[in-house]
């Protein structure tokens, strides 16, 4: 009975080393998307303040890379510290694969929740990505949870998966039972292998959300990418 509003800041965009077929920020595909590196803490603070003023309950820092390098992780930590001191909004992160030490540091910096999506069912995943495994993603979720971070995970629907595979993903989410579930609806990006993928019917999208809510009644569900066009 409550709407939770979260604003994302894509602090590092494009040129990701992974080959996820849906992603316009992968270095494997020519999508014409602008590339930029990490901003300064001051630049992020300005945007975080605006997000809070506009009613956001949380602010999520997202980076398009496989995992943060030690140098980039230090920069992200400085950004988080500045947000904590100067804004006072709940911080969440989506930074790719983490080490145990990095996860513990995020917890120390009062990061509330860590996002790392499964993307799709385990049986579908090899068709979607070949540069890392499904187990790699599960391992990162376990590392984050062991560090005391709340979990946000989910996937993308409309990748060409079957209904059975959507249920497979949902059952995996029910096993993990994250505090937050994020579901994206594919927006086909020109230049990616899925650029010609047919959109899901709205009735199918509603059915998927209904099943997720039925199986995970306590998790926050967030409608993420694709919500504007579906």
Please place each PLM-identified region on the residue numbering.
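Core AdoMet radical
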Residues: 28-47, 51-141, 149-159, 179-184
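Glycine-rich beta-to-alpha transition loops that act as phosphate-gripper elements at the mouths
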Residues: 93-98, 223-229
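Glycine-rich phosphate-binding "P-loop"
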Residues: 63-66, 192-201
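A short, acidic, amphipathic alpha-helical segment used as a generic capping/interface helix at domain edges
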Residues: 208, 229-230
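Canonical Radical SAM [4Fe-4S] cluster-binding loop centered on the CxxxCxxC motif
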Residues: 6-43
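Conserved C-terminal portion of the radical SAM core fold
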Residues: 135-194, 206-224
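Terminal or standalone catalytic/regulatory effector modules within metabolic enzymes
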Residues: 1-5
């Amino acid at each position: 009975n409550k709407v939770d509003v979260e604003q994302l800041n894509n602090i590092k965009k494009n040129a990701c080393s992974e080959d996820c077929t849906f992603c316009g920020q992968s270095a494997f595909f020519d999508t014409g998307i602008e590339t930029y590196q990490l901003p300064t803490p001051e630049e992020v603070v300005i945007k975080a303040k605006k997000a809070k003023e506009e009613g956001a309950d949380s602010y999520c820092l997202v980076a398009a890379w496989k995992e943060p390098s030690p140098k980039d992780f230090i920069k992200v930590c400085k950004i988080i510290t500045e947000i904590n001191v100067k804004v006072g909004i709940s911080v969440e992160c989506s930074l790719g694969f983490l080490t145990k030490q990095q996860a513990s540091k995020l917890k120390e910096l009062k990061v509330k929740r860590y996002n790392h999506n499964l993307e799709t069912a385990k049986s579908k995943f090899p068709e979607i990505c070949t540069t890392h495994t499904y187990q790699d993603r599960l391992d990162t979720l376990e590392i984050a949870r062991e560090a005391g971070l709340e979990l946000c995970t989910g996937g993308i629907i409309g990748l060409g998966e079957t209904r059975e595979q959507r249920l497979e993903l949902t059952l995996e989410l029910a096993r993990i039972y994250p505090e937050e579930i994020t579901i994206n609806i594919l927006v086909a990006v020109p230049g990616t292998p899925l650029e010609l993928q047919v959109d899901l019917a709205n009735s199918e999208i509603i059915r998927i959300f209904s099943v997720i809510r039925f199986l995970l009644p306590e998790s926050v569900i967030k409608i993420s990418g694709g919500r504007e066009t579906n």
